[in-house]
């Protein structure tokens, strides 16, 4: 971790939006008719367009949310330099206050770390702490970042989740770079936070798994899915996110603590040597 990264990250941390906004949007002027689906969509679109147009020339509302509270998602907004975690993403089976700390750190902690890292990925790094499009890194730091990031591009270029016309269809490393950077940064930040929280406390195994193993299992389980091949083809060609399995295996293969947690042998598929491991920050 560099001082540059740490101080800037603390600025983002101060601008968290968690659960729900302080000010609720007034929908009194929007007509909703349960018998008119098309009309509802059209009127809602018009309502939103008018609301946004009315913002032109007005002071920036840094308290505005881009997601509604029930949304099961999270985001980092570079132009606002803030993170948003709606209530929907903070509920079971993702975050569960009844669960042990380890899987919660792996799952929700990984999400928080992911969004924080977006402030320093290939796009987020182009915005300064006030949300202005400004190159605030030195040329030396920028060049080193590009060099390290190319390691991830090469790694993900080698992943193929599906075939098209009987030929392997490979993930696009450059298209997915920002999200892959955030996934890697996310799991590393979450693991560091987890170990800091558990410092000085004895390991608490559960169902035969150590705490470190529980952490990585929690990180992985959030990405369980069953996708049709046709959908995978579309996703690989257009989605800036990697397919779910590589959002797990892609990051952790670069985390040496993962290999240690599961006592992986040096020649195992999920192990990289120190020389080949992608280290960004």
What residue ranges belong to the model's regions?
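Single conserved hydrophobic/aromatic residue that forms the stacking wall/gate
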Residues: 1-9, 13
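Intrinsically disordered, low-complexity linker/terminal regions across diverse proteins
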Residues: 10-281
């Amino acid at each position: 971790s560099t001082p540059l990264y740490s101080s800037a990250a603390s600025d983002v941390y101060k601008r968290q939006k968690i659960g729900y906004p302080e000010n609720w949007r007034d929908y009194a002027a929007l007509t909703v008719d349960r018998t008119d689906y098309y009309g509802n969509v059209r009127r809602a679109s018009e309502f939103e367009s008018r609301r946004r147009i009315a913002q032109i020339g007005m002071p920036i509302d840094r308290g505005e949310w881009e997601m509604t509270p029930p949304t099961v998602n999270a985001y980092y907004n570079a132009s606002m330099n803030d993170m948003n975690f709606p209530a929907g993403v903070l509920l079971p089976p993702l975050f569960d206050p009844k669960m042990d700390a380890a899987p919660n750190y792996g799952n929700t902690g990984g999400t928080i770390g992911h969004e924080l890292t977006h402030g320093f990925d290939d796009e987020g790094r182009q915005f300064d702490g006030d949300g202005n499009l400004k190159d605030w890194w030195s040329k030396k730091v920028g060049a080193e970042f590009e060099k390290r990031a190319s390691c991830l591009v090469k790694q993900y270029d080698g992943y193929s989740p599906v075939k098209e016309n009987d030929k392997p269809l490979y993930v696009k490393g450059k298209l997915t770079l920002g999200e892959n950077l955030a996934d890697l940064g996310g799991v590393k930040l979450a693991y560091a936070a987890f170990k800091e929280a558990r410092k000085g406390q004895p390991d608490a195994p559960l169902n035969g798994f150590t705490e470190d193993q529980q952490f990585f299992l929690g990180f992985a389980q959030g990405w369980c899915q069953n996708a049709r091949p046709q959908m995978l083809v579309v996703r690989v060609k257009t989605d800036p996110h990697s397919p779910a399995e590589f959002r797990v295996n892609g990051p952790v293969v670069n985390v040496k603590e993962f290999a240690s947690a599961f006592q992986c042998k040096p020649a195992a598929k999920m192990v990289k040597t120190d020389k080949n491991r992608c280290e960004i920050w």
